[in-house]
Amino acid sequence: MRSIKVEHYEAFSTVPSKGNPAGIVLDGKGLTDSDRQKIAKEVGFNETAFPLPSERADVNIRFFTPGHEINLCGHATMATIYALKTKGLLPDRDEITIETKAGILPIRLSIDVDRSMMITMKQAAPQLRAFSGSRSELAASLALEEKDLHEELPVVYGSTGTWTLLIPIKKLDAFKRMQPNNQHFPHILQEMPRASVHPFCLETYDQEADMHARHFSSPYSGTVEDPVTGTASGVMGAYYHKYIESSPSLQLIVEQGHEIGKDGRIAVTVTEQTDDVMIEISGNAVLIREFEVRI
């Protein structure tokens, strides 16, 4: 058996235990995809990232849940870039590129007003697709009633790299009542049975935030809930622009994680382009600890 060093970071917060955890394996030389999957399962976080050399970008990042590989993960990207930058493993410039299975994506690095590193990541082109399943069954899968869903806003699938089902909820208090039946999601999400589920609303705990959300995992991922979700927050920006406020430029704050003891914040920028919108998410990260797993 091999002993693999894993670094535990939390993204979208600078306060330990308040962000979204990700495992980072910096020395992944010689690992097979089967090895990476075993490591992700042993680590047990929603995502574990494996930075690798790239011939097309400054770094290639692979993302694994405990159950399978995914194309892109926002919080694990933030954590990986933070780790590489603070260890001097990235080029000494403010703009870099990363290779992912969602494409080549630009990353911008800056120093925030409190001297913390801010990482801005362009998302893949947003896609929104209709949901034709049962709204009542969907609500029941979250231990809600159909009347908790917003009547004037649509339920749609969305992606800026990873597909999720965006579910507009009327009131903030419904989020404390949610008890997801993840195993039932594929039956309801017939168009995309492997998608995750992302309820959100326009009421927030923080008056400076624009949207509140929770994120429930696909049962195939091996996890139940994601504390603070970058890619889903990005596509929420595209949803907001299409269905709520179609301004040429939007600066949004998404809050997530309160119901499970987290307190994450994700900055989402939406910019109109000629025939689409550009989505960027911004956040930071903090190192928690190092540990080892054996495979």
UniProtKB/Swiss-Prot annotation:
UniProt GO MF annotations: isomerase activity
GO BP, one annotated term: biosynthetic process
Assigned GO CC terms: cytoplasm
InterPro entries with a match to the protein in the record: Phenazine_PhzF-like
A Pfam family recorded for this sequence: PhzC-PhzF
EC annotation from Swiss-Prot or TrEMBL: 5.1.-.-
Lineage top rank: taxon: Bacteria
Keywords: Isomerase
Active site: 47
Family indicated by similarity: Belongs to the PhzF family.
Protein name: Uncharacterized isomerase BH1950
Taxonomic path: Bacteria, Bacillati, Bacillota, Bacilli, Bacillales
